[in-house]
Design a protein with these regions (language model features):
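Short, small/polar residue-rich loop motifs at catalytic or cofactor-binding pockets
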Residues: 41-48
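Conserved acidic
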Residues: 10, 14, 68
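A short acidic/small-residue loop/turn micro-motif
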Residues: 66-72
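Short, solvent-exposed loop/turn elements at beta->coil junctions and helix N-caps
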Residues: 36-40, 92-95
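Conserved "boundary/linchpin" sites in short secondary-structure elements
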Residues: 1-9, 24-32, 54, 58-65, ...
Length: 127
């Protein structure tokens, strides 16, 4: 009697877990740009990037989804590009998808230093 094919194992990673791995990777590659400590209650700039990677983690597209500060946008884009290739998104997305897109938010403190929302702690309370 022929046996039924064994289904592929379910992906062990979630998008949130992958984003945390990517955020650590970006921070390790940009130590001079990281904002240490608690973020201020009123952030000078917030930049949201849409990031597309292939199966190997190569950046194929990066777009600014939201920003009101051109300088912060340039720092976010340069920091991400300097971090490439990113870790590969193993087991995420449709089975035969060649590309995966996700977003990350850069939270800027003073002097264009940032934290990534995926890993950022709480902000200081307002006055």
């Amino acid at each position: 009697i022929p046996q039924a094919p064994v289904p592929a194992p379910a992906p062990t990673r979630t998008l949130d877990a992958y984003k945390a791995v990517v955020a650590h990777h970006v921070m390790q590659r940009n130590p001079e740009r990281i904002f240490e400590g608690e973020l201020p209650p009123m952030l000078p700039a917030v930049v949201v990037l849409n990031i597309t990677v292939d199966r190997e983690g190569q950046l194929t597209d990066v777009q600014v989804q939201r920003s009101r500060d051109q300088g912060a946008s340039e720092v976010a884009l340069a920091s991400l590009r300097r971090s490439g290739p990113l870790p590969p998104p193993d087991g995420l997305g449709p089975q035969h998808a060649d590309l995966m897109t996700f977003s990350e938010t850069f939270l800027f403190g003073e002097r264009y230093r940032f934290q990534l929302r995926t890993l950022a702690g709480p902000q200081r309370a307002g006055l």
